[in-house]
Design a protein with these regions (language model features):
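Short, small-residue-biased leader/transition segments that mark boundaries at the very start
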Residues: 25-32
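Phosphate-binding site recognition
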Residues: 35-396
Length: 396
């Protein structure tokens, strides 16, 4: 008969000996200390937040434990701003859509199609906005939110682009179909159902968000926040495809009814890359504030600041790569704030953390077209070309 003898890593029977994590002899102590260090390193590696490339929904990033560069103080600025409508223009891949989703998740009193309330408060746990006091936090999850992205309207014909915009409108009506469970006139109920089923008239689609905000107000007893992302995509596309006049008529009607003469509007945030002239689609909109890269108020709200880049690199143990990162991706000065390209930083850290590459790469260069700039430069007169040459040479 053989009996197995119970063996322990720790000599002796006392709890004190086990708690000291020691074995006899100096070499044993060194070995244990090395093991503990390695285990701590492994645990830290396992707990690192994931880098979410191409994920634009704030909720998805938080729910999947993704690395999030905290831009929530932007919400505080929006609350304190007197502007009814704010238009942000920033370069592509600069976090505009992610910020829109973040704004939506903070403000929205979200209700499912079955009429059940959704609690998104946990998404902001530990973020900077939670330290801003009750006056700011009293706005959290208090408003109905209308969310529209226009990026799907990049189509070869007006009919196809219009159909895509109508589809986006229908989806938003479906998302808010719970309002049909509340009090609503028969006429409004019929209009709502027609739009949500894609059977509305052109006039009903053109005024859809003004109508939806009214329906939401009657259900929530709160004015709506309207978020419009990539507002310039259908107009830039239409310009090159030859149906600009048709498209701008529809966009102007949609925007004016929702943003200009709408008594059920609380605030609106619009984002895009280009600054479409106010006379084109914002005629008579006196409550519009345009925030471009030349302003400082929201200068750190889009893109990554140097301190944010340093923090991210340190988190993934890449702090020694800052000089290379700065040389490659520190290409912007928003008024007096140095800004790094976030798309490039995220891809760089992802590749380096997984040892996919040892070198910096031009991640941003093929993400979109600059055709509108090329055309404008080609059509520029001598005075404009002289101004461009001055800028290229570092002048102002």
């Amino acid at each position: 008969n053989c009996k197995l003898k119970r063996m322990s890593l720790f000599p002796g029977d006392s709890c004190a000996a086990r708690n000291r994590h020691e074995v006899s002899g100096g070499a044993g102590k060194v070995w244990i200390r090395g093991l503990r260090k390695e285990l701590r390193s492994m645990n830290k590696q396992e707990k690192l937040k994931k880098i979410a490339i191409g994920v634009e929904d704030f909720k998805e990033i938080i729910d999947k434990d993704g690395y999030f560069v905290d831009k929530t103080l932007m919400i505080k600025k929006l609350i304190e701003s007197r502007a009814k409508v704010t238009l942000f223009t920033r370069p592509r891949r600069f976090g505009k859509t992610l910020n829109q989703f973040m704004i939506r998740r903070f403000f929205e009193d979200e209700i499912t199609e079955k009429g059940e309330k959704v609690d998104n408060g946990y998404l902001f746990d530990g973020l900077k906005i939670t330290e801003c006091g009750e006056e700011i936090l009293s706005h959290q999850q208090q408003y109905p939110v209308i969310f529209l992205t226009l990026k799907s309207a990049k189509q070869p014909t007006y009919e196809m682009a219009y159909a895509c915009l109508v589809d986006e409108i229908c989806k938003e009506f479906e998302r808010h179909s719970y309002v049909l469970q509340g009090e609503m006139s028969q006429r409004n109920r019929e209009i709502f159902e027609r739009i949500s089923l894609g059977k509305g008239s052109d006039d009903e689609y053109a005024t859809a968000f003004a109508f939806l905000s009214e329906c939401l107000f009657k259900y929530h007893k709160k004015k709506a926040i309207i978020l419009i992302d990539e507002y310039d995509v259908p107009l830039e596309n239409a310009y090159f495809r030859g149906f600009y006049d048709e498209m701008i008529d529809f966009i102007r009607s949609l925007f004016e009814s929702a943003l200009k003469t709408n008594p059920y509007l609380e605030k609106s945030v619009i984002t895009g890359c280009l600054r479409i002239s106010k006379e084109s689609i914002f005629t008579g909109l006196n409550n519009l504030k345009v925030d471009s890269v030349l302003r400082t108020e929201y200068g750190d709200s889009f893109g990554f600041t140097e301190s944010e880049v340093e923090e991210m690199l340190a988190y993934y143990n890449l702090q020694e790569e800052l000089p290379e990162v700065k040389r490659w991706y520190d290409g912007y000065l928003f008024n007096d704030i140095e800004i790094y390209n976030p798309w490039s930083i995220i891809n760089y850290v992802y590749d380096r953390d997984r040892k996919i590459t040892k070198f910096a790469l031009p991640y941003w260069s093929n993400t979109s077209s600059n055709s509108i700039i090329r055309e404008m430069v080609g059509e520029a007169d001598q005075e404009a070309k002289a101004d461009l040459e001055t800028l290229i040479n570092g002048g102002t």
